[in-house]
């Protein structure tokens, strides 16, 4: 038992709104999540005007920790980290709570500063979130909000502000009314908090903004439920605020995709996020792959931050599912060659090129389940696996491409994903399918010099003179492919160069 437990790690975050526990296993330099346990303790709601933590709030916290403690018993002490954040930084009687909490858990609890919290959040994001290196990270907690800019693994500006979705709920939505005036007061107060640091952030700049909190997670769930793309914008936030105001009362707040669990602190979190967007002139935000707890875990593992998280994830998949990496590379190189030949005519961009490469590198993952229905197995795996660096919308696009890699084409899958415009996703699908057919001999010396020419939606495939006659298997596959593509109004025309 002890042998397997040495690869287990746990991170616990005693937050102002929720207590969280993450249990992972180290597998070949990456982490596999074994358990995520979250309990709404709402510790911050137990603070009075003198910052004294009520007995009831402490009891709620201790009850939760009793639950956590059993799960910790099989994990070595030096592979557990427990941190406490805003409320326990603030509470005048925090020592009383921490004394009992330490006895329950049987391991030390560290009350971390706002700056250290911001650093750990950034570290968690850097290990789990793909995209450009230069980023702004926003995390709205129950009692504090962290803003961090950084480049790759290095955090630059770290700020922790004393405002959170629980404290703002008690202060500005205490009457449980979702009135316009309550939102205005909450937003104004948030503006006042952010103003002193806003210019510093704006001057520093960033390429991408990611949100790492329950508020942002809730927004993502709302957008998925309503069939929107996953980019969070100020216009969408204002739209949701109007919807909340129409509901009138917190108890009657109903927005498709918003869970009951998240509803209570959603309006207060939304107010803070609107103010952050306005003060920092944020154009759009996406959801981060991880935050504080992931930062704690990766810190214990001492794993380096990869330059390209998505590539690391794909390499791990290739190893885990014993994929033929030579074949994946062969298909990938050919698909890239095809891409470069049609990118101008089809107005494809760098994002498209990366998605096509990613799909090629794992296109045979379904074979690890069974040859029969391999594309469906591949799509299922990609939809359901934890893929650090990939957002839910990106996973949906990848699974749509993999499900459509051969045989019948299901256009609805390509049209319903939101990571790329539908026509771009369709173009990538066509290139992937052709690259797979031409590479089917699994040898580099059998790849012909194929030329592609796109004319609107028509795709001309030009092969050397006599090639089709010399390669009857692939000639037949290409003939069948032209039929598959014609069924969805994708004209595919085969020609031999004279």
UniProtKB/Swiss-Prot annotation:
A Gene Ontology BP annotation from the UniProt entry: guanosine tetraphosphate biosynthetic process
Give the catalytic activity. guanosine 3'-diphosphate 5'-triphosphate + H2O = guanosine 3',5'-bis(diphosphate) + phosphate + H(+)
EC number from the UniProt entry? 3.6.1.40
Query: Which InterPro entries does the record associate with it?
Result: ATPase_NBD, Exopolyphosphatase, GppA/Ppx_hydrolase, Guo-5TP_3DP_PyrP, Ppx_GppA_C, Ppx_GppA_N, PyroPPase_GppA_Ppx
Keywords for the protein's UniProt record, in alphabetical order: Hydrolase
Query: Which EC main class describes this enzyme?
Result: hydrolase
The molecular function terms of the Gene Ontology recorded here are:
exopolyphosphatase activity; guanosine-5'-triphosphate,3'-diphosphate diphosphatase activity
Named in its record, the pathway it takes part in is: Purine metabolism; ppGpp biosynthesis; ppGpp from GTP: step 2/2
The protein's job, in short, is: Catalyzes the conversion of pppGpp to ppGpp. Guanosine pentaphosphate (pppGpp) is a cytoplasmic signaling molecule which together with ppGpp controls the 'stringent response', an adaptive process that allows bacteria to respond to amino acid starvation, resulting in the coordinated regulation of numerous cellular activities.
Q: Which family does it belong to?
A: Belongs to the GppA/Ppx family. GppA subfamily.
For this protein, the record's HAMAP family field holds: GppA
Q: What is this protein called?
A: Guanosine-5'-triphosphate,3'-diphosphate pyrophosphatase
Its source organism is Yersinia pestis
Q: List the taxonomic lineage.
A: Bacteria, Pseudomonadati, Pseudomonadota, Gammaproteobacteria, Enterobacterales
């Amino acid at each position: 038992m002890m042998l397997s437990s040495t690869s287990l790690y746990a991170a616990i975050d005693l937050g102002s709104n929720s207590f969280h526990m993450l249990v992972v296993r180290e597998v070949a330099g990456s982490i596999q999540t074994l358990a995520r346990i979250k309990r709404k303790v709402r510790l911050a709601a137990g603070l009075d005007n003198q910052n004294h933590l009520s007995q009831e709030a402490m009891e709620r916290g201790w009850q939760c920790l009793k639950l956590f403690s059993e799960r910790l018993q099989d994990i070595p002490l030096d592979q557990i980290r427990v941190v406490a954040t805003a409320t326990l930084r603030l509470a005048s009687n925090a020592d009383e709570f921490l004394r009992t909490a330490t006895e329950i858990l049987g391991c030390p609890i560290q009350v971390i500063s706002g700056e250290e919290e911001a650093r750990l959040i950034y570290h968690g994001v850097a290990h789990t979130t793909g995209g450009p290196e230069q980023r702004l990270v926003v995390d709205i907690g129950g009692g504090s909000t962290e803003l961090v800019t950084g480049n790759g693994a290095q955090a630059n500006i770290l700020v922790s502000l004393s405002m959170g979705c629980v404290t703002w709920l008690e202060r500005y939505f205490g009457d449980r009314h979702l009135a316009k005036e309550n939102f205005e007061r909450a937003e104004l107060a948030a503006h006042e908090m952010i103003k002193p640091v806003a210019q510093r952030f704006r001057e520093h700049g960033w390429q991408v903004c990611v949100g790492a909190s329950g508020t942002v997670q809730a927004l993502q769930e709302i957008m998925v439920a309503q069939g929107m793309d996953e980019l969070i914008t100020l216009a969408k936030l204002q739209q949701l605020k109007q919807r909340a105001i129409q509901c009138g009362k917190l108890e009657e707040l109903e927005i498709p995709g918003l869970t009951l669990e998240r509803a209570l602190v959603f309006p207060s979190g939304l107010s803070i996020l609107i103010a952050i967007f306005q003060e920092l002139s944020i154009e759009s935000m996406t959801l981060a792959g991880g935050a504080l707890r992931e930062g704690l875990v990766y810190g214990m593992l001492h794993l380096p931050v990869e330059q390209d998280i998505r590539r690391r994830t794909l390499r791990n998949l290739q190893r885990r599912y014993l994929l033929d990496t030579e074949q994946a590379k062969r298909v990938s190189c050919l698909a890239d060659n095809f891409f470069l030949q049609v990118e101008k005519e089809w107005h494809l961009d760098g994002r498209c090129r990366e998605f096509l490469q990613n799909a090629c590198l794992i296109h045979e993952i379904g074979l690890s389940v069974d040859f029969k229905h391999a594309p469906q197995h591949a799509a299922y795996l990609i939809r359901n696996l934890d893929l650090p660096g990939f957002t839910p919308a990106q996973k949906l696009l990848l699974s749509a491409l993999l499900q459509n890699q051969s045989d019948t084409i299901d256009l609805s899958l390509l049209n319903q994903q939101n990571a790329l415009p539908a026509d771009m996703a369709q173009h990538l699908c066509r290139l992937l399918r052709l690259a797979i057919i031409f590479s089917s001999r699994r040898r580099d010396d059998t790849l012909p010099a194929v030329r592609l020419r796109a004319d609107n939606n028509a795709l001309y495939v030009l092969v050397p003179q006599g090639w089709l006659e010399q390669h009857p298997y692939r000639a037949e596959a290409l003939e069948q492919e032209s039929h598959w593509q014609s069924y969805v109004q994708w004209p595919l025309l085969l020609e031999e160069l004279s």
